[in-house]
């Protein structure tokens, strides 16, 4: 008996070696032989979850709190594969699973290498789904005891194996799968291979990733889960979105949104002025500190930007003048208009009602400008008048031009005016001094001051545009290129950016705007596709060499701020032109009007022009194309004005039309 027992292990070893060599043996025979040679398995011990064992180093000990799982079956010590005893010696040591943990046992090393989805420090660590485990348990219970033990043994081996061995085991299994099994495998892993990287990463990195998304993608991300929504709605992400789009064209998608409403800023400024004057402020008039989420700010601006893009607006018509309207200006609440009938009218924008009429000029009002405290007007009667537009009182009258005053522009200290006498007069409010700028050979139709650089721009019927030095009265440079009388010149904001080519042709944000609005024909206008617009000229040559005086005045050594980099002009040759100021080069010519252009307005997002052809056009500076054409006036459009959410046009038909693009 003792001899027979001593030879049994040798016989089993011989049979095992024979099985290893016999590669032609059928899988069923090999499985039967392997099962028959296995000693009876004992109750498996808990070995931790499989997600915590994908390592080439020692695994942590099991604790009494770990749930029992299908994957926790552990074979007896005598049946452990060599790689198991090499890599996880302590895991298969015989011990009571409910015994307290011995602190003297070896712990996992700090530099242990995990599969990236099984790292215990990651919140996205893979865990077996409870419904899946329950279903597998039920399916397993329908099998024979031997089959259950074999499958549990295989699962335990795979669960305890390091990453390299797991890959080899999987490769072998996949290589033996038939097509239905491969299809089952593909369907099973389709959802399992997804990972919630946003939850796993630090918030700073998640914010950085989300900041690269456009609006449509960001809104889609917010619908994934509660955690994604919390990150996608965060002020950090939407503040970055506002920086990219508000008051500028985004280089990625081409979208630009209007600036924020300035009403709150103006209210605060008004309170400061009242306090400085020693006046009491009622408690209900004091500005309250308010903080709007950046997402709400972007949402409001996006609605306005979409309305601009598709021409969705409401129109208010102001009637009251008895002759053509020649000039206008508006702010948040007030509209001021000047007419051939020698009057200036102040209107309430919200109600469309006339507030008061300013009378005093003896001829046509050709130009006006107002701020919070005063309104200054110029007339063909050769005078300039300063008004208190709130009371209607004329404060003072300036004379000096030998011809009618055609244009004016003022800042806090200086007034510039242009006249039929071919001159520009500079008036100083503080010391009452004046300076005359001579050089134009015909009427001066437009003047614009640039306070920072101490310069003034002018446009004339002599077909030229000039830039002047306010300190010396000298002409710095003359720009030639128009073939018709230049009616308007407009230095563009320093924030304006010009690019010859678009960086992004696909505008995914259009998906959020819904369907396009109906055509704005008749009183509203119509889309640019219906207008006889031509492609812009983007390769115009320089007009003439830059004046050495320009380079001498605006260098870093002088410390004098340079004028705005770009300016826009309009002329009776039917075109608008965009110029680079410091080189004198015409960058782009805008074609579309079929008669001369009289009115011009612009901001960083769009240009607006009014012409003899009874039409007003909105242009995209980025592409040079006409975005929309507005019709409805029965006479030439002589003047236009523009804000973030409104546009106004005045015409010789005595009407003013206000288009509001607010949501």
UniProtKB/Swiss-Prot annotation:
Biased composition (Polar residues): 1-15, 56-77, 526-541
Domain F-box: 195-241
Cystine crosslinks: none
GO biological process: protein ubiquitination
Keywords from the UniProt entry: Repeat, Transcription, Transcription regulation, Ubl conjugation pathway, WD repeat
WD repeat boundaries on the chain: 320-359, 361-399, 400-437, 439-480, 544-589, 592-629, 632-663
InterPro entries: F-box-like_dom_sf (IPR036047), F-box_dom (IPR001810), G-protein_beta_WD-40_rep (IPR020472), Quinoprotein_ADH-like_sf (IPR011047), SCF_subunit_WD-repeat (IPR051075), WD40/YVTN_repeat-like_dom_sf (IPR015943), WD40_repeat_CS (IPR019775), WD40_rpt (IPR001680)
Compositionally biased residues, Basic and acidic residues: 502-522
Signal peptide range: none
Listed Pfam families: F-box-like (PF12937), WD40 (PF00400)
Region feature (Disordered): 1-78, 502-547
Pathway membership, UniProt: Protein modification; protein ubiquitination
Transcription keyword on record: yes
Similarity annotation: Belongs to the WD repeat MET30/SCONB/SCON-2 family.
Subunit organization: Component of the SCF(sconB) E3 ubiquitin ligase complex.
Function: Component of the SCF(sconB) E3 ubiquitin ligase complex involved in the regulation of sulfur metabolite repression, probably by mediating the inactivation or degradation of the metR transcription factor.
Name of the protein: Probable E3 ubiquitin ligase complex SCF subunit sconB
């Amino acid at each position: 008996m003792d001899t027979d027992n001593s030879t049994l292990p040798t016989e089993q070893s011989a049979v095992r070696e024979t099985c290893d060599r016999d590669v032609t043996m059928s899988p069923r025979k090999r499985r039967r032989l392997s099962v028959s040679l296995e000693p009876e398995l004992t109750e498996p011990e808990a070995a931790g979850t499989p997600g915590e064992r994908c390592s080439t180093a020692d695994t942590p000990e099991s604790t009494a709190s770990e749930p029992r799982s299908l994957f926790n079956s552990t074979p007896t010590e005598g049946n452990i594969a060599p790689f198991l005893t090499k890599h996880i010696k302590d895991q298969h040591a015989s011990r009571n699973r409910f015994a307290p943990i011995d602190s003297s046992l070896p712990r996992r090393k700090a530099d242990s290498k995990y599969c990236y989805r099984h790292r215990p420090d990651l919140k996205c660590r893979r865990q077996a789904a409870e419904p899946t485990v329950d279903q597998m348990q039920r399916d397993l219970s329908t099998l024979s005891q031997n089959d259950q033990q074999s499958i549990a043994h295989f699962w335990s081996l795979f669960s305890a194996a390091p990453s390299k061995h797991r890959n080899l085991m999987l490769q072998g299994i996949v290589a033996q799968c038939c097509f239905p099994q491969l299809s089952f495998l593909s369907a099973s892993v389709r959802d399992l291979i997804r990972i919630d990287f946003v939850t796993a990463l630090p918030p700073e990195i998640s914010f950085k990733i989300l900041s690269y998304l456009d609006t449509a993608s960001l809104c889609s991300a917010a619908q994934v889960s509660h955690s994604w929504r919390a990150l996608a709605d965060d002020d950090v992400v939407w503040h970055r979105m506002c920086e990219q789009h508000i008051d500028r064209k985004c280089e990625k998608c081409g979208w630009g949104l209007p600036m924020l409403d300035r009403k709150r800023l103006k209210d605060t400024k008004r309170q400061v002025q009242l306090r400085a004057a020693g006046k009491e402020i009622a408690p209900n008039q004091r500005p309250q500190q308010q903080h709007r989420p950046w997402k709400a700010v972007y949402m409001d601006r996006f609605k306005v930007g979409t309305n601009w893009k598709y021409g969705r607006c409401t129109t208010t018509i102001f009637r009251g003048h008895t002759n053509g309207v020649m000039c206008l200006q508006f702010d948040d609440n007030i509209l001021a208009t000047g007419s051939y009938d020698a009057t200036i009218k102040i209107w309430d924008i919200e109600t469309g009602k006339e507030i008061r009429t300013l009378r005093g000029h003896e001829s046509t009002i050709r130009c006006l400008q107002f701020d919070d405290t005063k309104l200054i007007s110029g007339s063909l009667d050769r005078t300039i008048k300063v008004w208190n537009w709130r009371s209607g009182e004329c404060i003072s009258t300036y004379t000096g031009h030998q011809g009618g005053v055609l244009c004016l522009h003022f800042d806090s200290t200086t007034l510039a005016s242009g006249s039929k006498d071919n001159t520009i007069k500079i008036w100083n409010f503080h010391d009452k001094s004046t300076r005359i700028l001579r050089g134009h050979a015909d009427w001066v139709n437009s003047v614009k001051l640039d306070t920072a650089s101490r310069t003034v721009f002018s446009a004339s019927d002599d077909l030229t545009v000039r830039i002047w030095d306010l300190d010396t009265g000298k002409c710095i440079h003359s720009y030639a290129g128009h073939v018709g009388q230049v009616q308007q010149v407009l230095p563009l904001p320093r924030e304006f950016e010009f690019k010859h080519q678009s960086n992004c042709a696909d505008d995914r944000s259009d998906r959020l705007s819904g369907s396009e609005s109906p055509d704005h024909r008749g009183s509203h206008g119509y889309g640019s596709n219906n207008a006889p617009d031509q492609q812009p000229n983007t390769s115009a040559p320089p007009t003439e060499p830059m004046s050495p005086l320009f380079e001498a005045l605006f260098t870093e050594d002088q410390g004098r701020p340079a004028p705005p980099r770009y300016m826009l002009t309009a002329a009776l040759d039917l075109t608008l032109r965009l110029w680079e100021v410091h080189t004198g080069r015409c960058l782009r010519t805008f074609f579309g009007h079929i008669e001369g252009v009289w009115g011009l307005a612009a901001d960083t997002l769009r240009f607006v022009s009014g012409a003899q052809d009874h039409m007003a056009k909105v242009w995209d500076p980025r592409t040079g194309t006409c975005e929309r054409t507005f019709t409805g006036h029965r006479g030439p459009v002589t003047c236009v004005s523009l804000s973030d959410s409104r546009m106004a046009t005045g015409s010789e038909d005595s009407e003013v039309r206000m288009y509001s693009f607010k949501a």
